[in-house]
């Protein structure tokens, strides 16, 4: 009986570790980068603590409504929605879904590190 319980517990632990490994490694192998959401600026769609998975950014994806992750000059990463695109200047204006106003400075396409694909809530 004890052998049976140990066998079942071992299988449960193994499967749990397999699921965790899947969340950690499979997206990376498929070309996704992951970022933690530290503020409520994209709530309720993307909650605080969620892990956002992004694909590489291409200029053709600079369109209104797309959610992108970009790097501020100080190095901080921000995930916000594009609300306008200036193709001539190659910049976008972004805004968090929960914010009342747009972000203060336009974001150059070179600052964009990825386009939102999906997230896993905390």
Question: What kind of region is each of these model predictions?
Answer:
Residues 67-69, 93:
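Residue-level detector of beta-strand face positions
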Residues 79, 83-122:
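Extended, hydrophilic extramembrane loops/domains of integral membrane proteins
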Residues 30-32, 63-65, 77, 87-89, ...:
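Extracytoplasmic
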Residues 1-50, 56, 121-122:
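Protein maturation boundaries and topogenic segments
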Residues 37, 66-67, 78-85:
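Short beta-strand-centered aromatic/proline hotspots
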Residues 49-51, 63-66:
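Structural motif
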């Amino acid at each position: 009986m004890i052998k049976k319980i140990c066998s079942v517990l071992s299988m449960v632990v193994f499967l749990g570790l397999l699921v965790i490994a899947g969340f950690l490694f499979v997206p990376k192998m498929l070309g996704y980068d992951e970022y933690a959401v530290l503020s409520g600026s994209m709530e309720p769609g993307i909650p605080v603590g969620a892990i956002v998975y992004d694909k590489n950014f291409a200029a053709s994806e600079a369109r209104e409504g797309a959610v992108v992750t970009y790097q501020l000059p100080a190095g901080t990463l921000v995930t916000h929605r594009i609300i306008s695109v200036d193709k001539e200047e190659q910049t976008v204006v972004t805004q968090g879904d929960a914010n009342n106003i747009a972000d203060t400075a336009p974001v150059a396409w070179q600052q964009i590190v990825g386009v939102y694909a999906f997230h896993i809530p905390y």
